[in-house]
UniProtKB/Swiss-Prot annotation:
Keyword Transmembrane helix recorded: no
Positions bound to Zn(2+): 42, 78, 93
Pfam families tied to this protein: Cu-oxidase_4
Protein's name according to its UniProt entry: Purine nucleoside phosphorylase aq_167
């Protein structure tokens, strides 16, 4: 399942999607939000949050079944992914290193170990193949989603993330096909070397 009729322009910077008792948000990160955010290091570590008072840990994905506890990840070109199960939810920061290390598969495995076998994935804007120039070494890391143009190599991490979701049995996937690099309203480290980030988060409501 795909959905691409997401808002454009400034409206895209304050998006909320309610799915049942779950609320997903995509907005500019201010640093004042009361949200559980992992210490992101481009790893394949998945944090299972079972205590709302737990301090931030190093990792690039979080899963939880706690009610009214918002979890999220920060991105500015990497792929932000929200995973929705019946009782558990997850937030994933998938840069090219995380995609190479299998962060998506490991997060899905953690959710399935908690009994989640019907998961919906929401994939939000990231750098895409139109703009994301990479080195030739990427041919060693990824066998697909690479294109050469004018002697340069480009990689599409969002498409790679979607294909990894499919390979791990996820059939319900909503994709916001937007490139952060060529969308000036969205923060892009590659374009601006900015410290700004987008915050993609999810909360299970009572």
């Amino acid at each position: 399942m795909y959905k691409q009729d997401f808002p454009e322009g400034k409206e895209a910077l304050n998006l909320e999607i309610r799915l049942g008792n779950k609320l997903v948000r995509f907005r500019k990160f201010t640093g004042k939000e009361k949200i559980y955010l992992p210490i992101q290091r481009h790893t394949d570590k998945v944090i299972k949050l079972i205590d709302k008072d737990s301090p931030p840990l190093e990792g690039d994905a979080v899963i939880t079944n706690l009610k009214n506890v918002e979890i999220g990840v920060r991105t500015a070109d990497c792929v932000p992914i929200i995973l929705l199960g019946k009782e558990w939810v997850g937030a994933v920061h998938a840069g090219w290193r995380g995609l190479k290390k299998g962060i998506i598969a490991k997060t899905l495995k953690a959710l399935k170990e908690e009994g989640e076998d019907d998961i919906t994935a929401l994939v939000f804007p990231s750098a895409k193949g139109c703009c994301y120039e990479v080195g030739k070494e990427f041919k060693e890391f990824f066998r697909r989603n690479l294109k050469e143009r004018n002697g340069k190599l480009f990689f599409d991490p969002q498409r790679e993330a979607v294909e990894q979701l499919r390979e791990n049995g996820i059939k319900s996937i909503l994709v916001w096909e937007k490139c952060t690099i060529c969308s000036p309203e969205l923060p892009s480290y590659r374009r601006d070397k900015t410290k700004e980030r987008m915050l993609t988060s999810v909360v299970i409501l009572f």
